[in-house]
Amino acid sequence: FFTGANFTVDRFNMANLGGDTTISQWTTPWHGLEAVLDYRNVALGLAVLFLSRMLALHYFMNDIDDTQIRERSRRRSLCTAGTFLVFFLVFLVSLLFAQGWSVDPATGIIAPEPYKYLHNLLAMPYVGIGLLAGVALVLWSIWLGWRGSRKAIWLSGSGTVLTVLALSLIHISE
């Protein structure tokens, strides 16, 4: 999504009745597994892993009426949230300072652009507000979850949706 992939697309193969109808092909023998060598992909994957753990712990605190489970979930949520925040911040900072690709509307030439995603975020203030609101909701839910509140799941879920939506929108801007 943000770091690219080594593959080619040949749409003319769709009309190739007698031969190969494969539209996309990997250009390396790794078939996309080389993406794990980029630290941004690893940071995003681990951030998603620990965010899903945190959401599950918040869900347990909200829906399971057992004081022992609720207390264990509360204790584990703080460590899980801290680990999530480290990996999410690594991903977010590296994304905002990463080089992206832009299209010159006059010539149609695709060229690298430094700080592309930061420029996209600054060009769309509503998306920036959505990103900040989503991050704030997740941070607030971490604090509520640590205090044992049953409402943490609602804030963390809403914050996750806003943050993922904003990250998707800064990718597609021209």
What are these regions, as identified by a protein language model?
Residues 1-151:
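Long, contiguous internal "core" modules enriched in hydrophobic/ aromatic residues
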Residues 154-162:
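Central hydrophobic cores of alpha-helical transmembrane segments
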Residues 162-168:
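Aromatic-anchored segments of alpha-helical transmembrane domains
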Residues 170-174:
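Conserved small/polar residues in nucleotide/adenosyl-binding loops
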